[in-house]
Amino acid sequence: MSKRYAFVAVSLLVLAAIALGACTPAATSAPEATQAPEPTTPPEPTAEPMPDIGSPEHPIKVLFVPSVDVAQIVTGGEIMKAALEEATGLTFEVSVPTSYAATIEEMCASPTDTMGFIPGLGYALASELCGVDVSFKANRFGYSVYWAQILVPRDSEIASIEDLEGLKWGYGDVGSTSGYMVPLVMFQEAGITPGEQIQTGGHNQSAQALYNGEVDFATTFYSPATDVDSGAAVYDASAPDIPEDLVSSCALTSDAGAIVCGNLRVRDARANIREAAPDVVQKERILMISPDIPNDTLSFGPEFPADLRAQIEEALVAFAETDAWAESIGSQDFYNWTGIEPATDAEYDFIRQMVAATGFSIEDIR
């Protein structure tokens, strides 16, 4: 081979080697390990602030037990609501739960925003159950106590509590102090056991059930008759009924607003069915009444704000002095509270003693 061709051949080999080197990938170092990012916790949503108690968005619940006609309670309750709202600037909501037990349970379930007009038995149970606290008690015609009464047909031969043995008993609700608990204790003390028991739904309904012949006797609240002229209560524990010589004169007033017998106005549960049964006094008599019972209460939920409670208490005292009170809770067809006065928890120890003696509990009134 000539030198010229040898040079060309070597040059081609060098160029080929360079080309091959260019095609070979360069060595690379292993990638460094990377740490996975820490998971991030999303920020918690900001809680919506609770509306103030007593605001339109969070009204104060005013609870009434369904012891009389619910329509009357709602109508009168709305009058009270309007008066309280005007006096305090707070917002209220009237409610009539379906039973005494439901009223107690609502106060315990809503401890910060409920106030309830509940009887002594309901208060005794609610205070033990969750700390419901009494503020006021009813005054009726000058009395801070009231009574249970046992009604029987006027033409019956029933002469004493012992004669009720085995007879059909009508009562409003097992949560009622005067309608059920106190009569139950009276029967136990007398050593008698009534027969069939009929829960009628309220005092009015019990008086009506007796009038209709659906039960043999009924137990309801008792308030003494009042003098037509003076308005004063006429009370004799040994003779609580309208005197026999006045019974035939008992009649509705021209406006159907009352039953009057001579100069006495009937104030017990019979008067509440006067329009449906205007001759109820001629058909039903009072067999006997109970010992004194502490009057019904206005109580507050256990965590009700003290400042709001004080405003409401002041407003209620002022409301009780107005004519509108008589159209509200002071109406004969409502709870017949003619006034209010301060109450203490200890006043209801008498009821607690009865509860303990009978083994009664909230379960018994559900």
Residue map of PLM features:
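Bacterial N-terminal signal peptides that target proteins for export
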Residues: 1-10
